[in-house]
Amino acid sequence: MALKERIGTVVSDKMDKTVVVAVINRYPHPTYKKIVSRTTRYKAHDPENTCVTGDRVKIRETRPLSAQKRWAIEEILNKTNQAKEVKK
C-alpha cells in the first residue's frame, strides 16, 4: 500500500517538532456541481523545527507518532521570508 502525500501550507509552528499544515481539498458538490473547498488541518512531525508559518510543504503519511500526529514533513516546497524565532 502506497503512503499518502498531501501539499499544504503551514498555519502554526508553535509546538516543538510539530507543525499544523492546512490542506485545501476541492471537489464538485454531488448535486449542484459547484466546486466546494474543504480545509483539513494535519499535525505533522518536523524534527529539526525548520518550518515556519506560511511555508508550502509536502507531507507524507507515517506511523502514529503521538495521539494526533500521523504525518511527517517530506520537503519544503516554498520557504517564506520570515525569520524563525528562537524557542525557549
From Swiss-Prot:
<dbReference type="GO" id="GO:0006412">
    <property type="term" value="P:translation"/>
</dbReference>
<keyword id="KW-0687">Ribonucleoprotein</keyword>
<comment type="function">
    <text>One of the primary rRNA binding proteins, it binds specifically to the 5'-end of 16S ribosomal RNA.</text>
</comment>
<dbReference type="GO" id="GO:0019843">
    <property type="term" value="F:rRNA binding"/>
</dbReference>
<dbReference type="Pfam" id="PF00366">
    <property type="entry name" value="Ribosomal_S17"/>
</dbReference>
<comment type="subunit">
    <text>Part of the 30S ribosomal subunit.</text>
</comment>
<dbReference type="GO" id="GO:0022627">
    <property type="term" value="C:cytosolic small ribosomal subunit"/>
</dbReference>
<dbReference type="InterPro" id="IPR000266">
    <property type="entry name" value="Ribosomal_uS17"/>
</dbReference>
<dbReference type="GO" id="GO:0003735">
    <property type="term" value="F:structural constituent of ribosome"/>
</dbReference>
<protein>
    <recommendedName>
        <fullName>Small ribosomal subunit protein uS17</fullName>
    </recommendedName>
</protein>
<keyword id="KW-0689">Ribosomal protein</keyword>
<dbReference type="InterPro" id="IPR019984">
    <property type="entry name" value="Ribosomal_uS17_bact/chlr"/>
</dbReference>
<keyword id="KW-0694">RNA-binding</keyword>
<comment type="similarity">
    <text>Belongs to the universal ribosomal protein uS17 family.</text>
</comment>
<dbReference type="InterPro" id="IPR012340">
    <property type="entry name" value="NA-bd_OB-fold"/>
</dbReference>
<keyword id="KW-0699">rRNA-binding</keyword>
<dbReference type="InterPro" id="IPR019979">
    <property type="entry name" value="Ribosomal_uS17_CS"/>
</dbReference>
